[in-house]
């Protein structure tokens, strides 16, 4: 625990539990009246390019999402406690997993407990919090098929499975058993793609191939409408489909092409919005990498530092040192990057729009 008291540990973790689903969504959930600007707040604070209401009223939507979120958090904490984790530790760890903030009680994070059972519970738990919470509402409505038919969900788990398999094949000679290799691969893929940042092993000792896979996952992130950060799986899917359609259009000029997500045509406005977000995202990452390179660190270190801070993950690749290797100026810039990345850029601008605060 270092020098932090239990009260400070709790407050730190509670802050990212509330922030995981969005402080503004939390405020909307407890508001009494529906005012102008709430739709923009909800749209901005629920990450991803496509915003959907699970019920007619935005206030009720926010309340339902938070009920699902907090219920999953309680279940997560109870399961960890039943697996042998002390009750305080289970609450702190569940907060870190639910909010995908990754703060733990001990400096060695999940590795402190030396328990495969706890490791797998944390792995699966963090993955579930990287899923779009609107999909869990389908489960409550007993519309299970809609949950499993979701295109982003299937892509999300496919990325996890493929990444875990590739890293497992790349590192299985490092550890004493195949079981350990799979455990570490699965855990690190889960904690990175969900931008949680829990620790279990020293990933800087892994081959560069595995580290670059993790770097790619840092950029992709979790699902839209989840507590995970990153670019989001749905945006990556849309970009890939736009690229495919543009390629086909060059080969078959007379062919009429449309972009579908979950069987529905995605409008041009949303496609353009995703492309604009990609442009801003890439510009910020390149700017961060350029500025951080002034500290004379190698490409993997500065790129992972940019990805880790802007996507709110935590781990640093390419070195066993911490972020202390960077200059005070770089740390200040990375601090601003963490704020902008957590808010997905646009909500930061939303705060300064008069329409958001209008009472009429």
Region locations from a protein language model:
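Membrane-proximal intracellular helices of multi-pass ion channels
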Residues: 1-360
């Amino acid at each position: 625990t270092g020098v932090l008291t239990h009260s400070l540990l709790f407050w730190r973790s509670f802050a990212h539990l509330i922030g995981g689903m969005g402080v503004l969504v939390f405020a909307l959930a407890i508001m009494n009246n529906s005012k102008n600007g709430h739709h923009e707040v909800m749209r901005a604070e629920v990450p991803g390019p496509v915003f959907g209401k699970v019920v007619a009223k935005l206030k009720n939507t926010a309340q339902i999402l938070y009920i699902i979120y907090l219920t999953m958090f309680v279940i997560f904490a109870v399961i960890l406690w039943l697996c042998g984790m002390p009750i305080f530790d289970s609450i702190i760890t569940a907060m870190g997993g639910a909010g995908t903030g990754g703060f733990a009680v001990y400096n060695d994070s999940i590795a402190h407990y030396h328990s495969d059972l706890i490791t797998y519970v944390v792995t699966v738990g963090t993955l579930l919090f990287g899923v779009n919470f609107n999909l869990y509402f389908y489960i409550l409505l007993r519309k299970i098929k809609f949950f499993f038919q979701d295109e982003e969900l299937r892509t999300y788990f496919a990325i996890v499975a493929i990444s875990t398999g590739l890293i497992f094949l790349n590192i299985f000679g490092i550890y004493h058993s195949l079981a350990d290799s799979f455990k570490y691969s699965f855990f690190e893929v889960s904690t990175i793609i969900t931008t949680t940042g829990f620790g279990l092993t020293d990933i800087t000792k892994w081959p560069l191939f595995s580290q670059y896979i993790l770097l790619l996952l840092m950029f992709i992130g979790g699902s839209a409408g989840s507590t995970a950060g990153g670019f989001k799986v749905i945006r990556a899917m849309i970009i890939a489909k736009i690229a495919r359609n543009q390629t086909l259009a060059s080969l078959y000029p007379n062919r009429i092409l449309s972009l579908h997500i979950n069987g529905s045509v995605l409008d041009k406005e949303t496609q353009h919005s995703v492309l604009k977000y990609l442009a801003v995202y890439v510009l910020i990452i390149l700017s961060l990498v350029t500025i951080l390179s002034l500290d004379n660190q190698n490409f993997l270190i500065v790129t992972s530092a940019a990805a880790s801070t802007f996507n709110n993950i935590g781990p640093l690749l390419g070195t066993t040192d911490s972020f202390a290797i960077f200059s005070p100026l770089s740390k200040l810039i990375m601090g601003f990057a963490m704020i902008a990345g957590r808010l997905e850029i646009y909500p930061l601008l939303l705060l300064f729009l008069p329409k958001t605060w209008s009472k009429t």
